[in-house]
Amino acid sequence: MVDFSTSVLAVRGCRIRLMRGGAGSPLVVLHGASGATVLPVMQQLAEKFDVIAPEHPGFGESDTPDWLDNIHDLAYFYLDVLDELKLKDVNLVGLSFGGWIATELAVRNTQRLASLTLCGAAGLYLAGVEQLDPFLRGDEQRLRDFFYDQIISFRNSDDRENFSPTAH
């Protein structure tokens, strides 16, 4: 099992928590709305890659900067993170909400990426479909937006006692 270290990285005046483990080509994992953690699959990937898992601004122990207003701000921020870490030919993995960020990053600078992998990506723009901004919604509304099946959203809620699923 590969050990992951935790450090703090400051970029554009914003301090974010960064987990890193393994060796090899860089593989950046952008977490979903539930937060950053070292997942079992990341342990396996760290056997072949230098796995880098930043915690998004506004999540967990990372700062919430005044300039953070939308998903586009996060995409540009992560391009600056890649610069700060001096990463090239990055394998970028986006999980759920992180998939949205990864997609926005990729359309802004494909030259930095060796690959793009999206897992259950949220927030992708489709013509005729309302685009939701999770920064403008409360925790319960975000869960309702992200999960069609309310039982799944209930299982993922940290506040189960106050959560009331609705039928679709």
Model-identified regions with their sequence ranges:
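Conserved catalytic-core motifs of eukaryotic protein kinase domains, centered on the activation segment
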Residues: 39-40, 62-68, 127-130
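Conserved alpha/beta-hydrolase "nucleophile elbow" surrounding the catalytic nucleophile
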Residues: 31, 90, 94-99
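Flexible "cap/lid" loop of the alpha/beta hydrolase fold
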Residues: 100-108, 113-146
